[in-house]
Amino acid sequence: MEHSRFLSGLILAAFLSRVSPYEVEMEELEDKVFVSCNTSIIWLQGTEGELLSDKKIDLGKRILDPRGLYKCNAPKEQDSNSKIFLQVYYRMCQNCVELDSATLAGIIVTDIIATLLLALGVYCFAGHEMGRFSRAADTQDLLRNDQLYQPLRDRNDGQYSRLGENWARNK
């Protein structure tokens, strides 16, 4: 995970961008995270970790997202009130997939193949007629060329012609 090392280095560089007598170092060995200071390091809050020496603390496995607030005391030749606070926020992506060019090309090729197979399946099932229809069903004259509307079939409309007899019609 090159990105996680880069991200943790970037976080440390942001905190330690000014010149200071402190030397804070963050290490990743195998799957563990270590923070060391050139002076004594003290846990304040968050992941307590295991104190390996007065200057180095083991924060545990990086997959468990160690985070916390730590303090480096001043070197003996410096002012004893001078302290540096170090905030560690370690975040690992456990369900991520690295997307490089080969993976992306594989996804695109698989998508094209699946689309072609789907088109072939639709063509095979819908492209061929199962039976031949009669010639009369193929051509049907609905209206003659000179006719605008189709004539109504024979019907008894006597009941409808009596509905509005008493109403005045506007013509």
UniProtKB/Swiss-Prot annotation:
Disulfide bonds join 37-72. GO terms for cellular component: alpha-beta T cell receptor complex; external side of plasma membrane. Residues 138-166 form the ITAM domain. It holds the Pfam family Ig_4. It comes from the Eukaryota. The chain crosses the membrane at residues 105-125. Residues 1-21 form the signal peptide. The modification Phosphotyrosine is found at residues 149, 160. It is found in: Cell membrane. Glycans are attached at residue 38. Residues 22-104 are extracellular. This is T-cell surface glycoprotein CD3 delta chain. It comes from Sus scrofa (Pig). The gene is CD3D.
